[in-house]
Amino acid sequence: RQRQMCIRDRGYKTVFFGGPMDEEMVAEATGYMQTRPIIATGHFAIGGLAAAMRRCCLIITNDSGPMHVAISQKVPIVAMYGPSNPKLYGPYTKDAVIVTAQPPCQGCADGMKHSCDDLQCMSRMTVEQVVAAAEKMLEK
């Protein structure tokens, strides 16, 4: 809700991208929102996703394939990193801010081997960190 208020107050709209497997998570997230977002989960193949992202002024994403699609379209991003290492996986662009909880175990997913059960790398990340990163990118 805090993130949406920040974005709404600036006149931006929220768009959710993702595959069909993301629809339940997106439905849950939209339940916390005061204004209706654009829901585009399950609507695009890779080329369509690239074209749709190109129209965005900022993408907030996790370390995923769509993050790299946004980068390929030269869209500024806020990339949330959990267990994977941004030095290894990118983003390799000046148009990105990386948000991480910086747990002592970061990098445990290198080679796709997750070695913890509590995912401190995700649970310690805050809305405030992501909002601050988004504001920084939107001010550029």
Walk through the language-model features, giving the residues of each:
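Interdomain hinge/lid region at the active-site interface
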Residues: 1
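Donor-binding and catalytic core of enzymes assembling or modifying cell-surface/extracellular glycoconjugates
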Residues: 4, 8-82
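Nucleotide-sugar donor-binding patch of glycosyltransferase catalytic domains
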Residues: 31-32, 39-40, 71-140
